[in-house]
Amino acid sequence: MKIGFSFLSLKTLSVKRAISITKKLGGNTLELFGDLVLFYRGKFCEKPESIKEFAVKNDIFLTMHLPYIDINLASFNDEIWEKSIESILKAIEYGEKAGIKRAVLHPGGVPLSHLVLIFLAQRRLRKALEFILEKAEKYDVEVCIENPYFEENDIFSNVDQFHKFIKGFGGKLKVCFDFGHAHISKKGIDYSLNLLKPFITHVHIHDNHGEKDEHLSLGKGSIDFKKYLDFLRNFDGTIILEINSLKDKREDLKRSVEIIKGEV
């Protein structure tokens, strides 16, 4: 089982430190925070080659959450759209040097929830993803798109629309299934998971109370994770605990891993 944490969950600015913490907490996978590649022209980034070497030495599998802050792959503004694609590709290039084999991105959004705008935004996203997938394939990096909550400003109105969009890529585009997001959405986890399962290679796990994206440790919200343990324990992909709440401590992270592994 490949299971671990998002970089933000570990509350450190050092990737090497995050790798060490991941191992200490019982994980074997770390998801890098792609936005660091862009912040202040990469001022906070460690050399990717040294990250790769340290990860291999510690037997840690690396994935990356591609940049999403101020990024919109569905933007109608050409300059923002082009810069968003450029930013994603820059992060993938850095990630490949660091040794990642899988990367996650957000779909983007629309300023108003209108059928015409949603249709056009999906076309923009499709074109952006064609560029990104072509580059990622050369780097041998798999790209996963994350299911949103399907709120007012999302470019997909529901999970069925999201599923139809993914099918259009003929298997080249995979899914990062976010349990917390699915719990908030109208159709819920069960329906969403069953629909998207053929495309899921990556999972984000965190808890909430079904109303907002709280990113709590397992058991602190209202998701009944016992229902999904068989799926998770037999899952061939990567599982990332995205527990970013300031209320949760490292003991909570460790316990969340143990719950999924069946150690508690």
Label the predicted regions.
Residues 1-92, 96-97, 261-264:
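N-terminal pre-domain/capping segments
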Residues 1-2, 16-23, 101, 156-177, ...:
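Histidine-acidic metal/acid-base catalytic patches
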Residues 3-7, 30-32, 62-66, 103-105, ...:
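Hydrophobic faces of well-ordered beta-strands that scaffold small-molecule active sites
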Residues 9-11, 34-36, 68-70, 107-111, ...:
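Active-site-proximal loop/turn and secondary-structure-junction residues that shape catalytic pockets
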Residues 16-17, 56-57, 74-174:
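Active-site acidic/histidine proton-transfer and metal-coordination neighborhood
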Residues 41-45, 74-79, 115-120, 154-157, ...:
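Short, solvent-exposed loop/turn segments at secondary-structure boundaries
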Residues 46-59, 128-135, 192, 227-231:
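Catalytic-core regions built around general acid/base machinery
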